[in-house]
């Protein structure tokens, strides 16, 4: 699978805010927000680094996808991960939607995936103009 990923020179909290703003500018709706640090702490008593998952969706594209194929459409949701690595670097990543749909022989879904890829790249570019080298540690 292929991911779009970048490290940014801002705090985790600022990266979360910048990501949400960039998603909004590209007309994505945030359907769910999962604070993995909190979930792991409360359910497993594990102290984990800041790690947030945003379940984002372009509603017009989701509607088209559901109309085209009600099962395959589930593959087009964007799971945006914002995490702070142990070295302090903050990374934002999302699965490239064309990597999940590329093997499916469904013309409309492939078209939707390419449109979603374009919107995904745009919101990633909008977050921070100059990404930093990102090396998890």
Go through the PLM ranges and name each one:
Residues 1-2, 24, 46-49, 85:
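Short glycine-enriched loop/turn motifs at secondary-structure junctions
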Residues 1-26, 125, 133, 137:
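Terminal, regulation- and interaction-focused segments at domain boundaries
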Residues 9-11, 57, 83, 95:
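Solvent-exposed residues in well-ordered beta-strands and their adjoining turns
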Residues 20, 37-38, 121:
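Short glycine-/small-residue-rich flexible loop motifs, especially phosphate/cofactor-binding loops
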Residues 29, 36-39, 43-81:
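Compact, glycine-rich, soluble single-domain proteins
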Residues 29-32, 130:
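Short, structured loop/turn "capping" segments at alpha-beta junctions
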Residues 79-106:
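Beta-strand/loop substructures that line and gate deep hydrophobic ligand-binding cavities in soluble
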Residues 103-137:
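Well-ordered alpha/beta subsegment
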């Amino acid at each position: 699978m292929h991911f779009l990923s970048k490290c940014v020179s801002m705090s985790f909290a600022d990266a979360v805010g910048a990501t949400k703003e960039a998603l909004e500018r590209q007309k994505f709706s945030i359907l769910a927000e999962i604070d993995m640090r909190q979930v792991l702490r409360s359910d497993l008593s594990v102290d984990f680094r800041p790690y947030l998952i945003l379940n984002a969706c372009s509603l017009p594209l989701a509607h088209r996808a559901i109309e085209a194929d009600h099962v395959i459409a589930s593959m087009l949701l964007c799971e945006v991960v914002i995490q702070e690595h142990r070295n302090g670097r903050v990374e934002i990543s999302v699965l490239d939607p064309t990597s999940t749909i590329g093997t499916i022989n469904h013309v409309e879904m492939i078209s939707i995936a390419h449109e979603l890829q374009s919107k995904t790249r745009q919101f990633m570019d909008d977050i921070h103009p100059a990404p930093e080298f990102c090396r998890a540690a």
